[in-house]
């Protein structure tokens, strides 16, 4: 049982409302043992992996700035890391994230009015495939196996996957 008013108590109460929980911070993932931190975080905001005991995946992490190595570890774990302005967000806010539009909206629970509070870009271009695969590593393995099998069968590369692109040079 969690002490009233603590972070874990707040999380438990939000979970009872059956809504997705996002972790939000101004600077995220610095000075931490990132895999341990991601596992602890996803334990509270992720979803159980079917047929894998005591392991979760997914979740949403929003940070004003997310340390690159923490961002990558979140990707590996199947989480959606988003860098966005978090200055208008507070604990317990009900938000709507529109990833393909790059919008975060705050929802007034009384009027159901949605106010856009910030915009963001999904990064990298393969992030949606990574989430569907349950993580970046799963995607890389699945894409590689698919390519090898299709090659053996003398088929073209699959167009199902978003392929990574190299950044443009200035």
Model regions: which residues?
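Feature captures the catalytic cores and cofactor-binding loops of soluble hydro-lyases/lyases
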Residues: 1-105, 109-119, 123-124
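Long, charged alpha-helical interface segments
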Residues: 94-96, 100-169
């Amino acid at each position: 049982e969690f002490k009233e008013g603590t972070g874990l108590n707040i999380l438990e109460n939000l979970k009872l409302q059956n809504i997705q929980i996002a972790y939000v911070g101004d600077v995220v993932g610095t000075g931490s043992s990132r895999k341990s931190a991601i596992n602890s975080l996803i334990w509270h905001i992720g979803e159980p992996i079917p047929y894998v005991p005591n392991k979760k995946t997914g979740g949403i992490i929003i940070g004003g700035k997310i340390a690159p190595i923490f961002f990558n570890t979140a990707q590996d774990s199947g989480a959606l890391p988003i860098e966005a302005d978090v200055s208008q967000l507070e604990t317990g806010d009900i938000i709507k994230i529109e990833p393909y539009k790059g919008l975060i909206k705050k929802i007034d629970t009384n009027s159901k009015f949605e106010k856009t509070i910030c915009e963001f870009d999904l990064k990298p271009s393969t992030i949606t495939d990574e989430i569907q695969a349950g993580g970046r590593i799963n995607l890389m393995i699945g894409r590689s196996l698919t390519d090898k099998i299709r090659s053996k069968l003398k088929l073209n590369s699959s167009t199902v996957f978003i392929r990574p692109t190299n950044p443009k040079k200035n």
